[in-house]
Amino acid sequence: MLKVVLITGISGSGKSVALRMLEDAGYTCIDNLPVRFLSEFVAGARDDGLERVAIAIDVRSPGELAELPGVITAMRAMGTSLRVVFLDANTHTLAQRYSESRRRHPLTDRLSRGGQTPSLLDCIALERDLLAPLRDQEHVIDTSDLTPGQLRAWIRDLVQADRPPLVLTFESFAYKRGVPSDADLVFDVRCLPNPYYDRTLRPLTGRDEPVATWLAGFEIVGQMIDDIAGYLRRWLPQYTQDTRNYLTVAIGCTGGQHRSVYVVEQLALRFAEHDPLLVRHRTQLPDEST
């Protein structure tokens, strides 16, 4: 059966990185496909016996974007195995990436008036407006603080999972970097004892045994994990019945290194029976340097 992955989202958020990863994974990839050709291309891929296809669609054909949600719905209704991933990033990060790459935003010419070149921020704002209907319907990955290597790993984990009633993701993050925009539920664990103030534990992470042992020694830590797990076990069935395909549970502490990482790892153990289950750590850990 043909599997289709559609990559879309804000320009500068990492669509090219995601598409290259899928190409390396054996997907037949096409970039910047106009929406009007999407159904025809997928039908041709099916007739040619292809098994995996990845397509990137961006804002360069803005007049057609309004049709994309309807096209996706129609293709799914016809039995197409279609997974849509929407990549996003905060405006500050996008502006920084454009500055580093020295590339023009694809909407620059569209917004030019009387020889006046629009600002990058104006282009980003218009693009957000154009893509908002699609963003609200699909799985969103906020790439603001992800390295290219982390994004490749996240996309790989996501597409390798068969389409389930609900993909459950636990992710840790640092409040000092902001709450990730892809989070459906956010739990603040900054009230828990902080290993950062123990000099021997400071360079470690919540995945290291000394930190895990230290945190497990506090009753309040176990109570926090029990309460979060209890909430999820009570309400996961309801989220599933709501035809939701993804649920991202974000756990945050100050630096995203100790407490949130530990809590995420413990929750992953408690929900190990849920398939598929994804675990993400937004703060770059020592073995995530690529």
From Swiss-Prot:
GTP binds at residues 58-61. Keywords: ATP-binding, GTP-binding, Nucleotide-binding. ATP binds at residues 9-16. One of its GO terms (molecular function) is GTP binding. Signal peptide: none annotated. InterPro entries: P-loop_NTPase, RapZ-like, RapZ-like_N, RapZ_C. Displays ATPase and GTPase activities. Belongs to the RapZ-like family. PANTHER family: RNASE ADAPTER PROTEIN RAPZ. This is Nucleotide-binding protein Bpet0443. It comes from Bordetella petrii (strain ATCC BAA-461 / DSM 12804 / CCUG 43448).
